[in-house]
């Protein structure tokens, strides 16, 4: 069984989130999604508009998602190992950065491949939040 993992805040769930989850599910048998807990969102200097429990339930109800787990830190490698994930799915805005090039090496050493999906243009939780202000 091929297990995939992705993580995010999923605040103000939108079509970009749905596209990522749909594409990810197309590449694995079981898709596990980490939803960032409110404390980690705050640590990163932001505030989620929707509380963790609601965001987790919204993601859990998506037909492409097999399981939801809390993302309480930024250590995706440890989480992938814990879950037995073969793939980590992320947005392509990280592709080619020095940090993610190094992550790719670390993940490959652990037998996990990072798959980058294109961001859906014209939509983001940040953009939606600004539109509502």
Regions found by a protein language model. Give the residues of each.
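Nucleotidyltransferase catalytic core that binds NTPs
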Residues: 1-133
